Amino acid sequence: MKHLTEMVRQHKAGKTNGIYAVCSAHPLVLEAAIRYASANQTPLLIEATSNQVDQFGGYTGMTPADFRGFVCQLADSLNFPQDALILGGDHLGPNRWQNLPAAQAMANADDLIKSYVAAGFKKIHLDCSMSCQDDPIPLTDDIVAERAARLAKVAEETCREHFGEADLEYVIGTEVPVPGGAHETLSELAVTTPDAARATLEAHRHAFEKQGLNAIWPRIIALVVQPGVEFDHTNVIDYQPAKASALSQMVENYETLIFEAHSTDYQTPQSLRQLVIDHFAILKVGPALTFSLREALFSLAAIEEELVPAKACSGLRQVLEDVMLDRPEYWQSHYHGDGNARRLARGYSYSDRVRYYWPDSQIDDAFAHLVRNLADSPIPLPLISQYLPLQYVKVRSGELQPTPRELIINHIQDILAQYHTACEGQ
């Protein structure tokens, strides 16, 4: 299963291809992605972050083995071949334990890496850029690289122990600002300089040599950089190729390396394609997919209100709002302003903090109620046209069934299609 190494080889040979990484644990998002990859006969890269999934359960309650089982079971149910499925771990390092002393945080990070690799994750992003409780701020490149090399050694040993060979593919480096969208309002963003990228690479190369890991350097397939793309609650900073041209040219001097771009959500299709052409050939997408899921659910809730007596409605939007107000920990430090501004952000922000609430049992019950209400009888075409106009065109042409579930899946796939097109290459 060398899909990623082969993709990099083809890209370096001039194909201008890439791959997108689906960064979500939501079952409908994953179903949409698996079905889309199946229809287009492409490999599918699905990633879990160190916040979502860890040896203690993360915020999803899943360990890496649980997540793999969940994804593989879904793939099997949709007849998607497991050898076309690539699982990745994102920002693996002491991220979850920055409030602990470095020694303790890195011991946890060792176990995190072991749990991901033992579970069969093959794309491993080593990220030790964050300062722990007793660390200087910021860390030097050398300290970051030494810690990453330590984790790489753990990963290699674990992989050989469980699978008989070390066939992992690595990503190193990190972007600024922090993962998951910026907290503040953005207007300008610093692109990683070629010198900074080279310094990161050389520090890691030196640290890997000290750990006796020279042989794995060709399996370090990507460096995470900031090409100048980001989003906040209501704005998107679009990719400007001219600002990243020196960075783009710099990676051409490395035979087996491309760039990985995070926070590519909400970029235009043209920008996504240009990112891949400019060697930012692994595109991470997460919030844009759950944002699209949320759009579809809000549209279906509006249709439900037109069709179903008020007392029989699911009340999905009100349930969602009530739960978010009752448990504000996932949005309170992100959304600011007066009451109305925060209300709008809870429902509509690009940063999509609402994604943390979909697993809640009350919200899930309301979702199931909504789907039942709309599955009982055909949804009138004019209402689909009003609230889901892109899906309406496909319903009218006969390529899409107008059931609640299919409308949701297809709405998410409209975003996936943009990434697929960007990554196809020449």
UniProtKB/Swiss-Prot annotation:
GO cellular component, one term: plasma membrane
Pfam families with a match to the protein in the record: GatZ_KbaZ-like (PF08013)
GO biological process entries: carbohydrate metabolic process; D-tagatose 6-phosphate catabolic process; phosphoenolpyruvate-dependent sugar phosphotransferase system
Record pathway: Carbohydrate metabolism; D-tagatose 6-phosphate degradation; D-glyceraldehyde 3-phosphate and glycerone phosphate from D-tagatose 6-phosphate: step 2/2
InterPro entries assigned: Aldolase_TIM, GatZ/KbaZ-like, GatZ_KbaZ_carbometab, TagBP_ald_KbaZ
SUPFAM superfamilies with a match to the protein in the record: Aldolase
Function: Component of the tagatose-1,6-bisphosphate aldolase KbaYZ that is required for full activity and stability of the Y subunit. Could have a chaperone-like function for the proper and stable folding of KbaY. When expressed alone, KbaZ does not show any aldolase activity.
Oligomer status and interactors: Forms a complex with KbaY.
Family to which the UniProt record says this protein belongs: Belongs to the GatZ/KbaZ family. KbaZ subfamily.
Protein name: D-tagatose-1,6-bisphosphate aldolase subunit KbaZ
Provenance organism: Escherichia coli O8 (strain IAI1)
